């Protein structure tokens, strides 16, 4: 039993040691969609263009001051994210770790929500978090 407690304690210490403090962004940063616009009615595939003011873009894994990269939430609520952990890569949370500023999505017909989250070189949210307004589009 004591070995188990020691092992669990070691794992917890390792997790805390690996946890990075969230970086503070400069004041006045804006994350937004260039396209599509909120309420747009489109056909799939949908081209999505990302906007950013007040910071720069850098690939994931490369630490430069005041830079980061985009993540796109598709039909996912920002409030569901664990901001104290790196963002997971899923079919609903798309990483653009090469520094991309646009993508093409194949979406099923119907209403969809999109939201951008800008994160640091470790896929970690800034503190305070940087994100766009959520937009809703309709794919016809």
How should each PLM-predicted stretch be described?
Residues 14-16:
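N-terminal signal peptide c-region/cleavage motif recognized by signal peptidases
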Residues 83-105:
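A beta-strand/beta-hairpin structural motif
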Residues 51-62:
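Short amphipathic, basic-aromatic surface patches that mediate peripheral association
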Residues 46-50, 101, 110-118:
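Short, well-structured beta-strand segments within conserved domains
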Residues 1-4:
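Positively charged n-region of N-terminal signal peptides that target proteins for export
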Residues 21-43:
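Short, compositionally biased P/S/T/A/G/V-rich stretches that sit at domain boundaries
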Residues 62-70, 131:
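Short coil-to-beta strand junction motifs in C2/discoidin
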Residues 108-123, 131-135:
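Internal, hydrophobic beta-strand segments that form the core of beta-sheet-rich folds
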